[in-house]
Amino acid sequence: AVIFTLDWHPGNHCSFAANGGQWPSHCVAYTQGAGLPDEFAGILASGKAKLFLKGQEQDKEQYGAFEDLATDSIEYAWLSNADSVDVCGIAGDYCVKASTENVLKVVAPEKVSILTDCVRSIDGGEALEAFINEKGITKK
């Protein structure tokens, strides 16, 4: 299974520094920089991948892509039927780590890998490395 997740924030999201949060404004819905690169359009159009949005609620910080994963959700079905799950993205110490924690509620650790060359962390990778070692996740 190929699953893409995107932050898709309203312009007044609570995580933004201008609204009292800790992050600069980023991934504002329908703006440049919020979407997937054009190179991914083909796999999405093929039906072999699924796109899920997160961070859409103005007053809720959401690091994990699957925080509120209900067993009857599309996300749960995709994850539970996956032969393997490779995780990558930004930021390794926040969203990638939290999303992987969410995935591990559904998928056994031996089926989960972190694509470390495709991850960037704010802390240089220390928190994610510790998490990978603690959970016994494979690095690719």
Predicted regions and their residues:
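Active-site-adjacent betaalpha module
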Residues: 10-18, 24-140
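Conserved phosphoryl-transfer catalytic core
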Residues: 1-5
